[in-house]
UniProtKB/Swiss-Prot annotation:
GO CC terms: host cell nucleus
Keyword ATP-binding found: yes
Pfam families attached to this UniProt entry: Parvo_NS1
Organism: Adeno-associated virus 2 (isolate Srivastava/1982)
Protein name: Protein Rep52
Record carries keyword Transmembrane helix: no
InterPro entries: Helicase_SF3_DNA-vir (IPR014015), P-loop_NTPase (IPR027417), Parvovirus_NS1_helicase (IPR001257)
């Protein structure tokens, strides 16, 4: 009984973990004649007790208080990307304790080498049982997610075949899934962590992409955008750092807003350079000097016009040219498809002396974009073309 209790407290489920934790005790138990059967029985009993009586916070939250958290790698990654570590830690703690109800998923989004997989891998390996989503196998994608403490969805995509089951799992609902060579099994509410550099709210159906499930999927997630690349010697997040981070979060809990985008703030800014570090710029000879563009008309910043951005432009504050993928991602929220924003001042200019009112048109037929969106626009050139009557055309007469 003492051995099983020790295995449960340490979260040990295999002989390899036992050797790594306490090699001397493993050798002493392995020295007896019937040791193999005792070791196997103890590990099996410990696994059953953990799966039935323990949850993820029992192994994610450390026992000892943390005095200095500034050297923690998870803390550094969040601070580097502009997040308030205390607020972000409260999001992670509430996610692990299933405090947010339907919002049961943390989505770490960003390009490669930004630390998203580093964080997710460390959290998954800290708990005794975690499952991985095999999105490449559309018949049994959640085969490994039954009776787990944490579910990890690594670099996946959302397809039309699995979206309904995925919404139930991401929302913390009980759902039965098919298993290979077995009968269907029930997945209980389990915290889910997703890492990807693609849009997980866009559903791929063959060679087409739809956004009809975007809002339901966003209602089930907290999204962290990690855009700052880490140094090559940054290192891996350890299990102890995960426990220290969650323990620090438990001791410094703040109120969390239930919203898709986790708000940023509280990051440290780099100090301004001193006068001694600023050198006088070199003068360009008049014969090769180019005209300055400061007096020219400012170019359009498309970064301000896109509410949702693709993986190539998610961290950009300045976009000089439009993006076709960003246009598609904003079609369900923007009216002006030419510039990608709702209130386009170029298409609908407003003067203080003589404001211009937008003329609303009534359409009997809608273009394919507004037909999919299910909204009637105030004005749309594509809808104008659809509603043209060829009998009224001079050339047809």
């Amino acid at each position: 009984m003492e051995l099983v209790g020790w295995l449960v407290d340490k979260g040990i489920t295999s002989e390899k973990q036992w050797i790594q934790e306490d090699q001397a005790s493993y050798i002493s138990f392995n020295a007896a004649s019937n040791s193999r059967s005792q070791i196997k029985a103890a590990l099996d009993n410990a696994g059953k007790i953990m799966s039935l009586t323990k949850t993820a916070p029992d192994y994610l939250v450390g026992q000892q208080p943390v005095e200095d958290i500034s050297s923690n790698r998870i803390y550094k990654i969040l601070e580097l990307n502009g997040y308030d570590p205390q607020y972000a830690a409260s999001v992670f703690l509430g996610w692990a304790t299933k405090k947010f109800g339907k919002r049961n998923t943390i989505w770490l989004f960003g390009p490669a080498t930004t630390g998203k997989t580093n964080i997710a891998e460390a959290i998954a390996h800290t708990v005794p049982f975690y499952g991985c989503v095999n999105w490449t196998n559309e018949n049994f994608p959640f085969n490994d997610c039954v009776d787990k403490m944490v579910i990890w969805w690594e670099e996946g995509k959302m397809t039309a075949k699995v979206v309904e089951s995925a919404k139930a799992i991401l929302g913390g609902s009980k759902v039965r899934v098919d298993q290979k060579c077995k009968s269907s099994a029930q997945i209980d509410p389990t915290p889910v962590i997703v890492t990807s550099n693609t849009n997980m709210c866009a559903v791929i159906d063959g060679n087409s992409t739809t956004f009809e499930h975007q809002q339901p999927l966003q209602d089930r997630m907290f999204k962290f955008e990690l855009t700052r690349r880490l140094d090559h010697d940054f290192g891996k997040v350890t299990k102890q750092e995960v426990k220290d981070f969650f323990r620090w979060a438990k001791d410094h809990v703040v109120e969390v807003e239930h919203e898709f985008y986790v708000k940023k703030g509280g990051a440290k800014k780099r100090p301004a350079p001193s006068d001694a570090d600023i050198s006088e710029p070199k003068r360009v000879r008049e014969s090769v000097a180019q005209p300055s563009t400061s007096d020219a008309e400012a170019s359009i910043n498309y970064a301000d016009r896109y509410q949702n951005k693709c993986s190539r432009h998610v961290g950009m504050n300045l976009m000089l040219f439009p993006c076709r993928q960003c246009e598609r991602m904003n079609q369900n929220s923007n009216i002006c498809f030419t510039h990608g924003q709702k209130d386009c001042l170029e298409c609908f200019p407003v003067s203080e002396s003589q404001p211009v009112s937008v003329v609303k048109k009534a359409y009997q037929k809608l273009c394919y974009i507004h037909h999919i969106m299910g909204k009637v626009p105030d004005a749309c050139t594509a809808c104008d073309l659809v509603n043209v009557d060829l009998d009224d055309c001079i050339f047809e007469q």
